[in-house]
Swiss-Prot record:
Residues 21-65 are annotated as: 5 X 9 AA approximate tandem repeats. Belongs to the cornifin (SPRR) family. It is found in: Cytoplasm. Expressed in uterus. Cross-linked envelope protein of keratinocytes. It is a keratinocyte protein that first appears in the cell cytosol, but ultimately becomes cross-linked to membrane proteins by transglutaminase. All that results in the formation of an insoluble envelope beneath the plasma membrane. It comes from Mus musculus. Transmembrane segments: none annotated. Sequence repeats lie at residues 21-29, 30-38, 39-47, 48-56, 57-65. It comes from the Eukaryota. This is Small proline-rich protein 2B. Keywords: Cytoplasm, Keratinization, Repeat. The keyword Transmembrane does not apply.
Amino acid sequence: MSYYQQQCKQPCQPPPVCPPPKCPEPCPPPKCPEPCPPPVCCEPCPPPKCPEPCPPPVCCEPCPPPVCCEPCPPQPWQPKCPPVQFPPCQQKCPPKNK
């Protein structure tokens, strides 16, 4: 006789009453740390200190035009004047930046 046949011969029984499930205690609320204190901010940065703008470059004065001698009066024994050597300017100007 199988297990099912044995079950069939027994009179019907009401299903057992299950006890209500035992629940654990509800979870305690999570313990939060104290809220963070507001960050301590430093003073705003001062504006950067810039050096004074560069002064304009100091240029030497342009060389004065050469002082030319008057043309020599024509002379029969010296038809042409010798070339006049002009002294160079005392100050040499720096090359101009392009």
